């Protein structure tokens, strides 16, 4: 279950890659703009402000996120991106920090690119930090007793969860697009107590939370804190620097 409040606790940090992605989309007057994986809708609203004449359509597979987006006035639909297809008037498709949850997303990108009209825009951003110390710490703890029997069948994502920018560029170039692909490592400056734990609670730890009782969850988090504090030490001035790699692709159909 997605928790919109937990996700929004780092809204400024999580939002920056969205704006960096959107800045490379050159559509002037799109008819329909689609946000795949809209979350609580706080960034979908930005699309509506940029293109006020467009129909802005949003999708998410979390009922909680869809409800939060609708409270912001977003035309949010409940559904899986795997089953989504563009309408004839779709000119911009944007997916921010969603497709990493979909193993077959390279095939989806190819299919969407082929279904969009010439001159349309397809843009996405995905985290590229699955081998980061934060994820490694979660996996190490989950392999220990008493957690291993409870969490053994969670498919913790390791290895090549997302492609490299060059791989995405090749994929969409072969699909007939002109492609702008890059990666950025953001150094987030965090100041709260145990900030990395709070950050991953809203994202990477969701599968763990769903398997544990409230008491177990509190204990798991307590045991995770020293591992994360060792990997991301708090500076003398109270700040913690949290590197976060992200991969971007903006394609225009031919």
UniProtKB/Swiss-Prot annotation:
GO CC terms in record? cytoplasm
Assigned keywords, A-Z: Cytoplasm, Methyltransferase, S-adenosyl-L-methionine, Transferase
Any Pfam family matching the protein: Methyltransf_23
Location(s) in or outside the cell: Cytoplasm
What domain of life does the UniProt record list for this protein's source?
Answer: Bacteria
Principal subcellular localisation of the protein: cytoplasm
Question: For this chain's UniProt record, which GO biological process terms are given?
Answer: methylation
For this protein, the Enzyme Commission number is: 2.1.1.144
As its record notes, the protein acts as a catalyst of:
trans-aconitate + S-adenosyl-L-methionine = (E)-3-(methoxycarbonyl)pent-2-enedioate + S-adenosyl-L-homocysteine
The GO terms this record gives for MF are: trans-aconitate 2-methyltransferase activity
Instruction: Family membership, please give it.
Output: Belongs to the methyltransferase superfamily. Tam family.
Q: What does this protein do?
A: Catalyzes the S-adenosylmethionine monomethyl esterification of trans-aconitate.
Entry protein name:
Trans-aconitate 2-methyltransferase
């Amino acid at each position: 279950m997605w928790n919109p409040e937990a996700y929004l606790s780092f809204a400024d940090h999580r939002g920056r890659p969205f704006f960096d992605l959107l800045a490379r989309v050159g559509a002037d007057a799109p008819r329909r703009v689609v946000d795949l994986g809209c979350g609580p809708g706080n960034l979908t609203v930005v699309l509506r402000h940029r293109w006020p004449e467009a129909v802005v359509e949003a999708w998410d597979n979390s009922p909680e996120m869809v409800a939060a987006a609708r409270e912001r006035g977003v035309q949010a639909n409940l559904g899986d991106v795997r089953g989504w297809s563009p309408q004839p008037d779709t000119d911009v498709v944007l997916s921010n920090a969603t497709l990493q949850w979909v193993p077959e997303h390279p095939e989806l990108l190819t299919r969407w690119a082929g279904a969009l009209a010439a001159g349309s825009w397809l843009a996405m951003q995905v985290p590229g930090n699955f081998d980061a110390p934060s994820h490694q710490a979660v996996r190490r703890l989950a392999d220990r007793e008493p957690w291993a029997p409870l969490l053994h069948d969670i498919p913790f994502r390791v290895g090549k969860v997302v492609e490299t920018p060059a791989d995405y560029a090749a994929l969409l170039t072969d699909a007939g697009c002109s492609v702008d692909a890059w990666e950025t490592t953001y150094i987030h400056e965090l100041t709260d107590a145990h900030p990395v734990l709070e950050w991953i609670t809203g994202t990477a730890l969701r599968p763990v939370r769903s398997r544990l009782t409230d008491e177990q969850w509190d204990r798991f988090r307590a045991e995770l804190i020293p591992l994360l504090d060792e990997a991301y030490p708090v500076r003398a001035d109270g700040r913690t620097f949290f590197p976060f790699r992200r991969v971007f692709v903006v394609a225009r159909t031919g």
